[in-house]
């Protein structure tokens, strides 16, 4: 199975400007992401950026990049521009790996591509991990997903779902949660033709309320298949403090 990986990488981050170029063990962050994509077995890896400094860094380590417009409001829109520039066929699989995920397991990238390949009814695929911590179940920054019996997403939300009526009504016994709680892992595989359709879909009210762009797909009646990640990835890096915390984790290898 062949698949592409596109890595959207922006320099202008409000909380962490220049994040893709921050050095980790002597290499810029974007290179670590690129290396994980290569290790996944992807046949084509491209960094999509609107910044010449990032493009130069990618060129310096021998990577491939595409310069995109600076007007995009989401990484998916940036992907769509690259799909057009590369003349990708409509059935080609494209995996979107965020440029601030230097520690993402290569296995997860391969898994999400395989997930889409094996589910022809879906236009998108993604991953999730089980939530075992009560605090995470109630954390709005941890995006939850509920699935149907075939593994297709029914809804993504920042709220706590499903709501365990018997347990949650009594705050004194919220010490454990059941088996239905899943945290969404922000990696997506798309069919190239669908990416071009997606950017022309009207945004949904639910997407805007939750600030979750994948809800646009469900709103318009398309399917997203969700697989349980074989490896739980560490959190992404949004701030310098996140980077310090993750680098202090002795379990991470470079």
UniProtKB/Swiss-Prot annotation:
Q: Which InterPro entries does this one have?
A: Cytidylyl_trans (IPR003329), KdsB (IPR004528), Nucleotide-diphossugar_trans (IPR029044)
Q: What class of enzyme is it?
A: transferase
Cellular location(s) = Cytoplasm
Alphabetical GO biological process terms: CMP-keto-3-deoxy-D-manno-octulosonic acid biosynthetic process; lipopolysaccharide biosynthetic process
Q: What is this protein called?
A: 3-deoxy-manno-octulosonate cytidylyltransferase
Pathway(s) of this molecule: Nucleotide-sugar biosynthesis; CMP-3-deoxy-D-manno-octulosonate biosynthesis; CMP-3-deoxy-D-manno-octulosonate from 3-deoxy-D-manno-octulosonate and CTP: step 1/1; Bacterial outer membrane biogenesis; lipopolysaccharide biosynthesis
Provide the family line.
Belongs to the KdsB family.
- Coarsely, its chief localization is cytoplasm
EC number in record: 2.7.7.38
One term of GO molecular function: 3-deoxy-manno-octulosonate cytidylyltransferase activity
Catalytic reactions of this protein: 3-deoxy-alpha-D-manno-oct-2-ulosonate + CTP = CMP-3-deoxy-beta-D-manno-octulosonate + diphosphate
Please tell me the species this chain comes from. Answer: Pseudoalteromonas atlantica (strain T6c / ATCC BAA-1087)
Q: Which domain of life is it from?
A: Bacteria
């Amino acid at each position: 199975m062949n698949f592409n990986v596109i890595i959207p990488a922006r320099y202008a981050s409000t909380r962490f400007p220049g994040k893709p170029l921050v050095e980790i063990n002597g290499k810029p962050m974007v290179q670590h992401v690129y290396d994980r994509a290569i290790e996944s077995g992807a046949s084509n890896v491209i960094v999509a950026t609107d910044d010449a400094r990032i493009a130069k860094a990618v060129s310096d380590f021998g990577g491939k990049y595409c310069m995109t417009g600076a007007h995009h409001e989401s990484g998916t829109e940036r992907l769509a521009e690259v799909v057009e520039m590369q003349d990708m066929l409509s059935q080609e699989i494209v995996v979107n790996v965020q440029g601030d995920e230097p520690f993402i397991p290569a296995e997860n990238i391969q898994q999400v591509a395989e997930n889409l390949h094996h589910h022809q009814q879906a236009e998108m695929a993604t991953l999730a991990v089980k939530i075992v911590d009560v605090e995470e179940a109630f954390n709005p920054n941890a995006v939850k997903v509920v699935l149907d019996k075939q593994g297709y997403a029914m809804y993504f939300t920042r709220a706590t779902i499903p709501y365990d009526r018997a347990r949650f009504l009594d705050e004194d016994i919220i010490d454990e949660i059941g088996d239905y709680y899943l945290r969404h892992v922000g990696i997506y595989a798309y069919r190239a033709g669908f990416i071009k359709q997606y950017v022309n879909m009207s945004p949904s009210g639910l997407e805007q309320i939750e600030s979750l762009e994948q809800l646009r797909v469900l709103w318009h009646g398309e399917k997203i298949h969700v697989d349980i990640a074989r490896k739980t990835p560490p959190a992404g890096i949004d701030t310098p403090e996140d980077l310090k915390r993750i680098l202090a984790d002795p379990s991470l290898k470079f």
